[in-house]
Swiss-Prot record:
The keyword Cell membrane does not apply. This is Acidic endochitinase. Gene3D superfamilies: Glycosidases. One of its GO terms (biological process) is chitin catabolic process. It is found in: Secreted, Extracellular space.
Length: 292
């Protein structure tokens, strides 16, 4: 009996150790949704390459605007045209892939006019995409794991309020995708709240802090970002040269040899974010074995 108890205790210990190791493991986040030729959401998750998939984008919201989900050529959310994605979201979740709704984007029309406006947007997102209830759920009944803030226009006001309101619902993963120059023009105050579980910094299309012939500026900027309060910090990169017209692409072999060894030493290193699935033609395959 004593031996049985010891064996059981050890089994539980190793199981819990495995769970904690896997939850702390580094991974790859990818954006999906802005190119109808990039494959389905289900097939994206089935690659086994990604820890997070960000569905992009809720491109219009706030300041009295009707919210608009823009999934490019994948589907039209009008008349429940994207509800079929519910099964694909659940398929992703069954494979331990976290699926987030990315709000904003580079070409959206969005802003928050007040703290009350931020609260209304939070309620809309919760009821339409997360654990709440609404007659209109553009992605069907599936419950997304959280919200990604890809805020690239407008002011920096009230995004911290939106983050807090979403966190108040409980069990909502929050991520942010700031540009690499510090401070970020839109998300600086929000990120400094410490509410974001993951921050994947866009180290591309920004010459002062991206890879260009060498990694000096990139790694200097990374070191500054490690001081921000987030559980996991990711290096955001283009998945192909054409994904970032203003630069920042790092060949896979260079990333593995010149960049990852340094950033993996950071205590809050979380992995790599890629823009986007449409451009990921083998890049994630090449780097995934070196991310952790």
């Amino acid at each position: 009996m004593a031996a049985h108890k010891i064996t059981t205790t050890l089994s539980i210990f190793f199981l819990l150790s495995s769970i904690f190791r896997s939850s702390d493991a580094a991974g790859i986040a990818i954006y999906w949704g802005q190119n109808g030729n990039e494959g389905s959401l289900a097939s994206t998750c089935a690659t086994g390459n990604y820890e997070f998939v960000n569905i992009a984008f809720l491109s219009s919201f706030g300041s009295g605007q009707a919210p608009v989900l823009n999934l490019a050529g994948h589907c039209n959310p009008d008349n429940n045209g994207c509800a079929f994605l519910s099964d694909e979201i659940n398929s992703c979740k069954s494979q331990n892939v976290k699926v987030l709704l990315s709000i904003g984007g580079g070409a959206g029309s969005y802003s928050l006019s007040s703290a009350d406006d931020a609260k209304q947007v939070a309620n809309f997102i919760w009821n339409s995409y997360l654990g709440g209830q609404s007659d209109s759920r553009p992605l069907g009944a599936a419950v997304l794991d959280g919200v990604d803030f890809d805020i690239e226009s407008g002011s920096g006001q009230f995004w911290d309020v939106l983050a807090q309101e979403l966190k108040n619902f409980g069990q909502v993963i929050l991520s942010a995708a700031p540009q690499c120059p510090i401070p970020d023009a839109h998300l600086d105050a929000a990120i400094k709240t410490g509410l974001f579980d993951s921050v994947w910094v866009q180290f591309y299309n920004n010459p002062p802090c991206m890879f260009a012939d060498n990694a000096d500026n990139l790694l200097s900027s990374w070191n500054q970002w490690t001081a921000f309060p987030t559980s996991k910090l990711y290096m955001g990169l283009p998945a192909a040269r054409e994904a970032a017209p203003s630069g920042g692409f790092i060949p896979a072999d260079v990333l593995i040899s010149q960049v990852l060894p340094t950033i993996k030493a950071s205590s809050n290193y979380g992995g790599v974010m890629l823009w986007s699935k449409a451009f990921d033609n083998g890049y994630s395959d090449s780097i995934k074995g070196s991310i952790g």
